Protein backbone atom coordinates (compact mmCIF):
# COMPACT_ATOMS: atom_id res chain seq x y z
CA UNK A 1 0.00 0.00 0.00
CA UNK A 2 1.47 3.37 -0.92
CA UNK A 3 1.15 6.75 -2.56
CA UNK A 4 4.51 7.51 -4.18
CA UNK A 5 4.89 11.15 -5.26
CA UNK A 6 4.80 11.50 -9.04
CA UNK A 7 5.73 15.14 -9.63
CA UNK A 8 7.03 14.46 -13.11
CA UNK A 9 3.82 13.23 -14.66
CA UNK A 10 2.42 16.73 -15.19
CA UNK A 11 5.23 17.72 -17.54
CA UNK A 12 6.44 14.39 -18.90
CA UNK A 13 4.71 14.80 -22.24
CA UNK A 14 6.40 18.13 -22.94
CA UNK A 15 10.02 17.25 -22.34
CA UNK A 16 10.50 14.20 -24.53
CA UNK A 17 10.55 11.66 -21.71
CA UNK A 18 8.02 9.02 -20.80
CA UNK A 19 6.45 8.86 -17.36
CA UNK A 20 8.63 5.87 -16.45
CA UNK A 21 11.86 7.52 -17.65
CA UNK A 22 11.32 10.82 -15.83
CA UNK A 23 13.77 10.90 -12.89
CA UNK A 24 11.26 12.78 -10.73
CA UNK A 25 9.13 9.65 -10.66
CA UNK A 26 11.88 7.47 -9.19
CA UNK A 27 9.77 6.68 -6.11
CA UNK A 28 7.02 5.35 -8.36
CA UNK A 29 9.60 3.12 -10.07
CA UNK A 30 10.78 2.00 -6.64
CA UNK A 31 7.19 1.10 -5.74
CA UNK A 32 6.96 -1.06 -8.88
CA UNK A 33 10.34 -2.65 -8.08
CA UNK A 34 9.19 -3.58 -4.58
CA UNK A 35 5.98 -5.08 -5.93
CA UNK A 36 8.06 -7.15 -8.38
CA UNK A 37 10.44 -8.34 -5.63
CA UNK A 38 8.00 -8.95 -2.78
CA UNK A 39 5.13 -10.12 -5.00
CA UNK A 40 2.29 -9.37 -2.57
CA UNK A 41 -1.06 -10.96 -3.28
CA UNK A 42 -2.45 -7.46 -3.80
CA UNK A 43 -1.22 -3.87 -3.90
CA UNK A 44 -2.99 -0.51 -3.63
CA UNK A 45 -1.59 2.79 -4.93
CA UNK A 46 -3.20 6.21 -4.44
CA UNK A 47 -2.45 9.43 -6.30
CA UNK A 48 -3.98 12.63 -7.68
CA UNK A 49 -7.08 12.26 -9.85
CA UNK A 50 -5.47 14.08 -12.79
CA UNK A 51 -3.27 11.03 -13.35
CA UNK A 52 -6.29 9.23 -14.83
CA UNK A 53 -6.67 11.69 -17.72
CA UNK A 54 -3.12 13.03 -18.13
CA UNK A 55 -1.91 13.01 -21.75
CA UNK A 56 -5.30 11.68 -22.86
CA UNK A 57 -4.85 8.50 -20.86
CA UNK A 58 -1.29 7.68 -21.95
CA UNK A 59 0.18 8.13 -18.47
CA UNK A 60 -2.24 5.80 -16.69
CA UNK A 61 -1.79 3.25 -19.49
CA UNK A 62 1.98 3.34 -18.88
CA UNK A 63 1.44 2.86 -15.14
CA UNK A 64 -0.93 -0.07 -15.62
CA UNK A 65 1.50 -1.75 -18.03
CA UNK A 66 4.36 -1.34 -15.52
CA UNK A 67 2.39 -3.25 -12.89
CA UNK A 68 1.06 -5.84 -15.35
CA UNK A 69 4.65 -6.87 -16.10
CA UNK A 70 6.04 -6.52 -12.55
CA UNK A 71 7.30 -9.85 -11.20
CA UNK A 72 4.80 -12.56 -12.04
CA UNK A 73 2.38 -9.92 -13.31
CA UNK A 74 -0.76 -8.31 -11.88
CA UNK A 75 -4.35 -7.82 -12.93
CA UNK A 76 -4.74 -4.06 -12.56
CA UNK A 77 -7.75 -1.80 -12.32
CA UNK A 78 -8.21 1.83 -11.33
CA UNK A 79 -10.95 4.28 -10.42
CA UNK A 80 -11.23 7.87 -9.22
CA UNK A 81 -12.93 8.02 -5.81
CA UNK A 82 -14.34 11.07 -4.03
CA UNK A 83 -13.75 10.89 -0.26
CA UNK A 84 -17.06 12.68 0.34
CA UNK A 85 -18.83 9.47 -0.69
CA UNK A 86 -17.11 7.42 2.01
CA UNK A 87 -17.81 9.18 5.30
CA UNK A 88 -15.27 11.99 4.88
CA UNK A 89 -16.46 15.61 5.10
CA UNK A 90 -14.39 16.68 2.13
CA UNK A 91 -14.50 16.84 -1.66
CA UNK A 92 -11.25 15.00 -2.37
CA UNK A 93 -10.89 13.10 -5.64
CA UNK A 94 -8.02 10.61 -5.91
CA UNK A 95 -7.15 7.76 -8.24
CA UNK A 96 -6.91 4.38 -6.52
CA UNK A 97 -5.00 1.72 -8.46
CA UNK A 98 -5.39 -1.89 -7.31
CA UNK A 99 -3.56 -4.99 -8.50
CA UNK A 100 -4.13 -8.70 -7.84
CA UNK A 101 -1.23 -11.06 -8.45
CA UNK A 102 -1.53 -13.41 -11.41
CA UNK A 103 -2.53 -16.85 -10.22
CA UNK A 104 -5.05 -15.56 -7.69
CA UNK A 105 -8.60 -16.29 -8.79
CA UNK A 106 -10.35 -13.26 -7.36
CA UNK A 107 -11.70 -9.84 -8.31
CA UNK A 108 -11.48 -6.52 -6.48
CA UNK A 109 -14.60 -4.37 -6.24
CA UNK A 110 -14.39 -0.71 -5.30
CA UNK A 111 -16.45 0.27 -2.24
CA UNK A 112 -20.03 1.36 -2.79
CA UNK A 113 -20.89 4.95 -1.98
CA UNK A 114 -22.32 5.56 1.48
CA UNK A 115 -25.69 7.28 1.73
CA UNK A 116 -24.79 10.05 4.18
CA UNK A 117 -22.76 13.03 3.02
CA UNK A 118 -21.08 14.89 5.90
CA UNK A 119 -20.66 18.66 5.89
CA UNK A 120 -17.72 20.50 7.40
CA UNK A 121 -20.04 21.75 10.14
CA UNK A 122 -20.98 18.17 11.03
CA UNK A 123 -17.41 17.31 11.97
CA UNK A 124 -15.90 20.46 13.53
CA UNK A 125 -18.75 22.51 15.01
CA UNK A 126 -18.38 21.02 18.51
CA UNK A 127 -14.77 22.20 18.89
CA UNK A 128 -14.14 25.25 21.12
CA UNK A 129 -14.49 28.58 19.33
CA UNK A 130 -11.20 30.44 18.90
CA UNK A 131 -10.18 33.91 17.83
CA UNK A 132 -7.05 34.71 15.84
CA UNK A 133 -3.98 33.57 17.80
CA UNK A 134 -5.89 31.80 20.59
CA UNK A 135 -5.05 28.34 21.90
CA UNK A 136 -7.01 25.56 23.59
CA UNK A 137 -6.43 22.44 25.69
CA UNK A 138 -7.24 20.21 22.72
CA UNK A 139 -4.08 18.97 20.97
CA UNK A 140 -3.45 20.71 17.63
CA UNK A 141 -6.44 23.05 18.14
CA UNK A 142 -4.49 26.33 17.98
CA UNK A 143 -5.61 29.29 15.87
CA UNK A 144 -3.22 30.99 13.50
CA UNK A 145 -2.35 34.61 14.29
CA UNK A 146 -3.65 36.84 11.49
CA UNK A 147 -2.72 40.43 10.70
CA UNK A 148 -5.24 43.22 11.17
CA UNK A 149 -5.38 43.65 7.39
CA UNK A 150 -6.20 39.98 6.86
CA UNK A 151 -8.86 40.02 9.58
CA UNK A 152 -10.48 43.03 7.92
CA UNK A 153 -10.61 41.25 4.55
CA UNK A 154 -12.00 37.99 5.90
CA UNK A 155 -14.65 39.88 7.84
CA UNK A 156 -16.36 40.72 4.55
CA UNK A 157 -16.50 37.14 3.27
CA UNK A 158 -19.79 35.41 4.08
CA UNK A 159 -20.41 31.71 4.75
CA UNK A 160 -19.55 29.96 1.48
CA UNK A 161 -18.36 33.23 -0.05
CA UNK A 162 -15.15 34.22 -1.81
CA UNK A 163 -12.83 37.13 -2.52
CA UNK A 164 -15.53 38.90 -4.53
CA UNK A 165 -17.25 39.67 -1.20
CA UNK A 166 -14.28 41.87 -0.27
CA UNK A 167 -14.56 45.55 -1.29
CA UNK A 168 -12.63 46.19 -4.49
CA UNK A 169 -10.16 48.55 -2.81
CA UNK A 170 -9.17 45.79 -0.35
CA UNK A 171 -9.53 42.79 -2.64
CA UNK A 172 -6.31 40.94 -3.57
CA UNK A 173 -5.54 41.82 -7.19
CA UNK A 174 -3.92 38.52 -8.08
CA UNK A 175 -3.28 35.07 -6.69
CA UNK A 176 -4.99 31.72 -6.43
CA UNK A 177 -8.76 32.04 -6.84
CA UNK A 178 -9.10 29.13 -4.41
CA UNK A 179 -7.86 31.39 -1.62
CA UNK A 180 -9.64 34.16 0.27
CA UNK A 181 -12.74 31.98 0.42
CA UNK A 182 -14.86 30.92 3.38
CA UNK A 183 -15.92 27.32 3.90
CA UNK A 184 -19.58 26.59 3.18
CA UNK A 185 -21.05 25.20 6.40
CA UNK A 186 -23.72 23.27 4.47
CA UNK A 187 -21.29 21.36 2.25
CA UNK A 188 -18.27 19.08 2.56
CA UNK A 189 -14.97 20.93 2.76
CA UNK A 190 -12.92 21.79 -0.28
CA UNK A 191 -9.91 19.50 -0.71
CA UNK A 192 -7.46 19.82 2.19
CA UNK A 193 -3.91 20.59 1.03
CA UNK A 194 -0.64 21.44 2.73
CA UNK A 195 -1.50 25.16 2.85
CA UNK A 196 -4.98 26.21 3.98
CA UNK A 197 -4.03 29.52 5.59
CA UNK A 198 -6.21 31.71 3.36
CA UNK A 199 -9.39 29.65 3.54
CA UNK A 200 -11.54 30.79 6.43
CA UNK A 201 -13.75 29.09 9.02
CA UNK A 202 -17.42 29.32 7.99
CA UNK A 203 -18.32 31.61 10.91
CA UNK A 204 -15.12 32.46 12.82
CA UNK A 205 -12.63 34.97 11.44
CA UNK A 206 -9.56 32.76 11.16
CA UNK A 207 -8.09 29.89 9.21
CA UNK A 208 -8.90 26.39 10.41
CA UNK A 209 -6.75 24.82 13.10
CA UNK A 210 -4.76 21.65 12.47
CA UNK A 211 -7.28 19.70 14.57
CA UNK A 212 -10.16 20.95 12.43
CA UNK A 213 -8.28 20.02 9.26
CA UNK A 214 -7.50 16.60 10.74
CA UNK A 215 -11.18 16.03 11.50
CA UNK A 216 -12.07 16.97 7.93
CA UNK A 217 -9.58 14.32 6.82
CA UNK A 218 -11.36 11.92 9.26
CA UNK A 219 -8.47 11.52 11.72
CA UNK A 220 -9.60 10.73 15.29
CA UNK A 221 -8.80 13.27 18.00
CA UNK A 222 -6.34 10.91 19.70
CA UNK A 223 -4.10 11.06 16.62
CA UNK A 224 -1.64 13.80 17.63
CA UNK A 225 0.47 15.59 15.02
CA UNK A 226 4.00 16.80 15.78
CA UNK A 227 6.15 19.47 14.12
CA UNK A 228 5.83 23.10 13.08
CA UNK A 229 2.44 24.42 12.04
CA UNK A 230 3.39 24.21 8.35
CA UNK A 231 4.80 20.69 8.75
CA UNK A 232 1.62 19.57 10.48
CA UNK A 233 -0.59 21.06 7.75
CA UNK A 234 1.49 19.24 5.14
CA UNK A 235 1.21 15.96 7.05
CA UNK A 236 -2.56 16.33 7.16
CA UNK A 237 -2.94 17.58 3.58
CA UNK A 238 -0.80 14.80 2.09
CA UNK A 239 -2.58 12.00 3.96
CA UNK A 240 -5.13 9.54 2.66
CA UNK A 241 -8.33 10.04 4.71
CA UNK A 242 -8.48 7.12 7.19
CA UNK A 243 -12.19 6.51 6.57
CA UNK A 244 -11.61 6.19 2.83
CA UNK A 245 -8.62 3.91 3.46
CA UNK A 246 -10.80 1.76 5.73
CA UNK A 247 -13.46 1.29 3.05
CA UNK A 248 -10.80 0.28 0.52
CA UNK A 249 -9.19 -2.08 3.05
CA UNK A 250 -12.52 -3.86 3.59
CA UNK A 251 -12.72 -4.54 -0.14
CA UNK A 252 -9.13 -5.77 -0.22
CA UNK A 253 -9.91 -8.13 2.66
CA UNK A 254 -12.94 -9.46 0.80
CA UNK A 255 -10.92 -10.05 -2.38
CA UNK A 256 -8.20 -11.88 -0.44
CA UNK A 257 -10.72 -14.00 1.45
CA UNK A 258 -12.38 -15.02 -1.81
CA UNK A 259 -9.17 -15.61 -3.73
CA UNK A 260 -7.77 -19.01 -4.62
CA UNK A 261 -3.97 -18.91 -4.91
CA UNK A 262 -1.85 -20.86 -7.35
CA UNK A 263 1.61 -20.60 -5.78
CA UNK A 264 3.13 -22.24 -8.84
CA UNK A 265 2.76 -19.00 -10.76
CA UNK A 266 5.08 -17.05 -8.48
CA UNK A 267 7.93 -15.33 -10.30
CA UNK A 268 10.97 -17.29 -9.14
CA UNK A 269 13.72 -14.88 -10.19
CA UNK A 270 13.31 -12.72 -7.12
CA UNK A 271 16.11 -10.45 -6.04
CA UNK A 272 16.83 -9.25 -2.55
CA UNK A 273 15.14 -5.94 -1.78
CA UNK A 274 17.96 -3.56 -0.92
State what each model feature region is.
Residues 7-177:
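Class I S-adenosyl-L-methionine
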Residues 4-5, 40, 89, 220, ...:
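Proline-centered helix-kink/hinge sites
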Residues 1-2, 45:
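Redox-cofactor binding/interface segments in oxidoreductases and associated redox assembly factors
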Amino acid sequence: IGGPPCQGFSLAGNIGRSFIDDERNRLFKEFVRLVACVQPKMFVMENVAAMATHLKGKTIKTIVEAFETAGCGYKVKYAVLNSANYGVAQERRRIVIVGIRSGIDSEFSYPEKLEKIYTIKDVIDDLPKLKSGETSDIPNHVAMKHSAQMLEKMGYVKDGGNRMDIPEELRPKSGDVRKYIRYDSAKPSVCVTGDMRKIFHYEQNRALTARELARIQSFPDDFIFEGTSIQIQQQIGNAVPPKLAYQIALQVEEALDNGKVSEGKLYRKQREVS
